[in-house]
Amino acid sequence: MDRSREAEMELRRGPSPPRAGRSHEVDGDKAACHSCCICGKSFPFQSSLSQHMRKHTGEKPYKCPYCDHRASQKGNLKIHIRSHRTGTLIQGHEPEAGEAQLGEMRVSEGLDGCASPTKSTSACNRVLNGAVPMDGSKILLRSSRKEVEGAASAQEDTEATVPCSFCKSRFERKKDLELHVHQAHKPFKCRLCSYVTLREESLLSHIERDHITAQVPNGSEACVENGKPELSPGEFPCEVCGQAFSQTWFLKAHMKKHRGSFDHGCHICGRRFKEPWFLKNHMKAHGPKAGSKNRPKSELDPIATINNVVQEEVIVAGLSLYEVCTKCGNLFTNLDSLNAHNAIHRKVEASRIRAPAEEGDSEDPLDTKQFFLQCLNLTPYVAGDVSPGGQAGRRVAELDPVNSYQAWQLATRGKVAEPAEYLKYGTWDEALAGDVAFDKDKREYILVSQEKRKREQDAPATQAPPRKRASVPGDPMLSGHLDPRPTSRPNRRASATTGQGKSSECFECGKIFRTYHQMVLHSRVHRRARRDRDPEGDRAARARCGSLSEGDSASQPSSPGSACAIADSPGLAEEVVDDSGEEAVPEPASGGQPRHCCSSGEVTPTALSNGDQNHKLGNNLPEKDISEPKVGSAMPSVSILENSSRETTKGPEQHRYSLDLKMPAFHPKQEVPSTTDRVDFPASMEITSLQHTLDSQAGHSKEKLSDLHKEHCGVGKRASAPDLVPLDLSMRSSRDEPSGKEACSLQAALVIHPCPYCTHKTYYPEVLWMHKRIWHRVSCSSVAPPWTQPSGHKSIRSNLVFLTRSGRTGPPPALGGKECQPLLLSRFARTQVPGGAPGSKGSSSPLGVTTKAASMPKNKESHSGGPCALWASGPDGYRQTRAGHGQEPPSAAVQGPLAKPKQEGSSRLAPSPGSGSLSRSTTPTPSVITRVGAQPSANSKPVEKLGGPAVGTGFTPPNKHSAPDSLKAKFSPQPQGQPPLKGEGGSPLPPREPSVKAAQELRTLATCAAGSRGEAALQAPPGAPPTLNSAKQEPAAEGQEKRLDILSIFKTYIPKDFATLYQGWGVSSPGPEHRGTSLTGTPRTQAHQGDFVCVECGKSFHQPSQLRAHLRAHTVVFECDGPRDSEVHTASTDAPKQGRDHTTPGTVPAGPLRKGI
């Protein structure tokens, strides 16, 4: 090595030799290279060889001067020294601590015995640093502090001042210098020598350069590392194959060949990974969102809820609630169940090991298998042997993430899929029918749009997701044994590159998919492959029914009478029975037509997106689909059951679903109503016959299932020992056998949750929630009926304006979702003036208006059943009569004859000739004062009259702003001197009922009240003084008018339009001038051509949506008379407005309103 160094130095000093000479020297160096005698590696330098030999010998010559740590490489010791704190590297300022530490510190270094490969010696080991040789080649380091003090005492005699080595300052005393250095500079001083520096990095460099030396261990002493003896090579054997390794990590890497590579598990959810950084990235999913601590949470961020309970984001630091099996991945509720499950794996492995050893013996292998099954209390499978790797019957159905709600909650971390805003994804039906995908960046569930699904469908087969690939039973990937980790996967990375970095891997075949949903769909291929290997179709269904032991899971069967997950998920029955899924073409039935009933193509996203079209009312269902049930002759029994449920929905169930989804009745659990309750439903007899046929087929299929299971149980009893009762994993027929009475009684004690839309039943409300959400597309976010809008900050649909904009035309919620009969038009169409009063030449309603009212939609007329009975006179009729006598002379006002009632407020009055003399009506019914001028000015008040001729004018044009007579008839008080009639006096307010019966009673009371008022007007005595013509006599009907005013206010009130509140007060106020006029002076019922008029109150609207929103106000039933003080206050505010009307010609001023006595 020395010669090579000398040659290298000569080459550096002198000129570069020629290439020939250089190549000759290089060849000489290669020939003289140093090789290892153990492994054969060659090195150009001896130092490199000596460092390499430490790997074989385990020598660690480099020792830490501050602890007992040793290292084989100098760089490793440098890294170790930096791990020490700075306080252990520098010398303490206290004299006792410093002296004790320096006195105890000994370095096993010799002056002449240094064995470093580089021949480097420490500078502090020489005599220059004050080291004195001791016995046994030991060196005792003197305290540098004592050394400095001795030098300082010698200098005090010669020099008067002491300089500072850092800032060149001088001090008279040594103590002052030390205080200055300690306070101003704070230097770092080496504990092993007198080296002092101001930088910590300089101190570390000094220790690495001067104090790190190598030492050869004495004899065959074992090197000690952190107090543990160094193990000799070849001391780590493999327990499986017996191969020995010198290092533990070599053995750990070797053990991956004998077991699964998922060695890194999550302690929260139990998921396992191959690499540690995968686990590290996975642990971020259990924490809060990235950046959520720094930014404030906006109102638009979705809130995670479970059953409408807000879930706060917390960092999960606890352990998992479930125990995970590391060999098969099943979940268990406690450790005892996991230990019992692991015993199965151990017995299976032990049986595999004993099988080759017992082959040479005379024992039959069948006896060994029989003994193993008897130990597990299992009956042998008669049809055929199951492969050793098969896990049939061992998977827990309740914890299957594909079929179970509980495992689905674990997989989604308790966050239920809920759209952030309903309007963001279009209509509600489209949102329910869309596909749900989990966005890993936003960590929320999103709805896949229709355009994206269309692009996926239109994409070529090469770019299609793996779930679209057709798989046939002859596929080599599916035909053989399902190895969890197959060796050949050529297209795995290619498909992963197209997945945009977000993939889900199938644990059975190793394929990678872009989304977890695609992987779930792909798993059906493996389920069909397992079913193809099984001769009977019942094996696949029983594989998910339960675990090996009853203690594997605390969850019990989720459906009454069935422990199978198929009963809770009807879509799984199609996957188990039908081979024509999304990845294969459905085979035609025996009749030549495809089996559309059982193919899973009906639940594809395209069919779900158009699912709302299948729930419409009317005759859009073709008769051939109703009369011809598409049931194949070769269809299995389970498919017949599914077919019967599907075909029944095409019959009467189809119409009932549509009614229940939009506006269900108050008895949702009732049976299917008769066809007489339907609206134009065709082919009722064919539907009935179809239903009977399907019921018989369903009963026949159930008998087949029960017979098949009894036969299977009988075979199991014959094969097992007579004193042992075999464990039935399916538990499907436990109710039919005598041995299952105990289980039947336990299951009967549980609460059964039936579906209100079909015959589905389950023990778990969560499963019922998912069933209604998926199959019936019902929003189950609340317990309210589906026609009520969801509450909360997201429920934009609960607003009245949203209801108007969405175009909802069904019956109001107050009627319980039932259609009510339209009001009869005959009680409004009068053709003669009652009582033969003068002025009967007033025209009746035009024919066009009647035709328009008759042709109005039913849903508009159905809202007219309002609380008409409230307008009947109360028990204060006599008090009103006494308060109305002699308060105003008859000559102060002019009374017009009574006009005929009109059907709508938009009808115009025909011109009638005026009368020069005063003409009074024989009937004392009150009339509104008519104010008519010869030529009305622009700023004059609009005129409203009942239809009689005016006084002082030769001709009065018809007034188009007149209010409807039906409203006036309801607002008219009782005549003077007329006692309360039997039909209207003291009519009580009926209680609020949500049924149709309450609405019919309200309409009957309203009809009676209207008829009694007409009779009262006809039977009034002709000699009664017309004292009701003045304005001061109208407040006499105090109780009656207050009722009418309160009702009319809220009947015409729209929450988004506060102007309607003032219009309601203006119309219903007791003042005569404000009967048809609002506070702003504009008439309330200005009906122009093309307006939409309310048939109840006569108010006109410009848009049909406004009329629909207004008609909902008529369905409100008030149970009290309302506040009386507010009415008096409002009436008093109208008084100044009445006083300003004295300037209008031909009018009579009305005094301020006041409360009657």
Curated annotation (Swiss-Prot):
One Gene Ontology term from the biological process aspect of the record: positive regulation of DNA-templated transcription
Q: Where is the composition biased (Basic and acidic residues)?
A: 1-13, 449-458, 531-541, 644-653
Stretches of Acidic residues bias are at 575-585
The record lists the lineage as: Eukaryota, Metazoa, Chordata, Craniata, Vertebrata
Q: Per its record, how is this protein called by name?
A: Zinc finger protein 516
Annotated crosslink Glycyl lysine isopeptide (Lys-Gly) (interchain with G-Cter in SUMO2) location: 630, 669, 1032, 1051
Q: Where are the zinc fingers (C2H2-type)?
A: 34-56, 62-84, 162-185, 188-211, 236-258, 264-286, 323-345, 504-526, 753-776, 1092-1114
Summed up, the tissue specificity of this protein is: Expressed by adipocytes more specifically in brown adipose tissue compared to white adipose tissue (WAT).
Subunit-level organization: Interacts with PRDM16; the interaction is direct and may play a role in the transcription of brown adipose tissue-specific genes. Interacts with PWWP2B. Interacts with HDAC1; this interaction is enhanced in the presence of PWWP2B.
Q: What induces it?
A: Up-regulated in response to cold in brown and subcutaneous white adipose tissue where it may regulate non-shivering thermogenesis (at protein level).
Kindly give the PANTHER family that the UniProt entry links to this protein. ZINC FINGER PROTEIN, ZINC FINGER PROTEIN 516
Does this UniProt record's set of keywords contain Methyltransferase? Answer: no
Q: Where is this region: Disordered?
A: 1-26, 449-503, 523-653, 831-996, 1013-1040, 1123-1157
Q: What is the recorded function of this protein according to its Swiss-Prot or TrEMBL entry?
A: Transcriptional regulator that binds to the promoter and activates the transcription of genes promoting brown adipose tissue (BAT) differentiation. Among brown adipose tissue-specific genes, binds the proximal region of the promoter of the UCP1 gene to activate its transcription and thereby regulate thermogenesis. May also play a role in the cellular response to replication stress.
Task: Write out the GO cellular component annotations.
Answer: nucleus
What phenotype is described for loss of this gene?
A: Knockout mice die immediately after birth. 20.5 dpc embryos display an impaired development of brown adipose tissue.
Pfam families (UniProt xref):
zf-C2H2
* Keywords of the record: DNA-binding, Isopeptide bond, Metal-binding, Nucleus, Repeat, Transcription, Transcription regulation, Ubl conjugation, Zinc, Zinc-finger
Q: Name one GO molecular function term.
A: DNA-binding transcription factor binding
Q: Which PROSITE patterns match?
A: ZINC_FINGER_C2H2_1 (PS00028), ZINC_FINGER_C2H2_2 (PS50157)
Query: What family, per the record?
Result: Belongs to the krueppel C2H2-type zinc-finger protein family.
Ranges of Polar residues compositional bias?
Answer: 494-503, 550-561, 601-612, 914-928
Query: Which stretches does the entry tag as region Mediates promoter DNA-binding and activation of transcription?
Result: 1-420
Subcellular location(s) of the protein: Nucleus
